[in-house]
Amino acid sequence: MLKDWDGVESLDSKGAVAFHAIYIHLVQNIFQDELQSFGDGSFDTFYSLKYIRTQAIRSIFDGKTNLWVDNVKTVKKETLNDIVNKSFEDAFIFLKVKYGNPSELKWGDVHQVTYEHNLDADPLVQRLINFSVGPFPMAGSEMTPRAASYSVSKPFDVRAGSSMRRIIDFSDFDNGYSILPTGQSGLFRSKHYRDQTEMYNRGEFKPFMFTYDAINSSKSSKLVFKSK
């Protein structure tokens, strides 16, 4: 799966599944034994600190430090090769137990996003209305320009991404493009509540007008607010 992978985290990528499963367990096998002494949740907090985590891993693989490599909870003194091999094995077991045959998994099968609404935290509201939108398969990850990061405690559920994507032409502000994760309206019954979701998920954009004349000439409807 990794040998033939082009490094692109597309929805149909099998290599992306293998890479991220191995990466999660690699980080766990290197750091978790030491971090557990700081209390529950310490490893999750460390994993969320992307820059620190990435720099630490680079330092280890560049040979600048081996302080974290050995598992302090075992008698054996592990080498980096031991940790890497264990991470491959752990990743395979994790994927097989949770999803079935790892060789058949595609990134979009496991890496998914639900645009959650706070009101859905109430089980009754969720059952009656369900303000949330999703789930949907999502390409990319925290390691790509198309940001879609997941929590290590719940791989591979997307927990964060871009709140808006926008392209600005500074020579012509009316020649811009933008897209939102769900829609322009926060009103649940509005046709614009979730009408941008599929485009956002596919990495597409909508024209973004800036000047009054451009907006007025391309409008499809008009909403007027009147005070009383």
Task: Please annotate each region the language model reported.
Residues 1-228:
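Long, compositionally biased non-active-site segments enriched in small/hydrophobic residues and glycine
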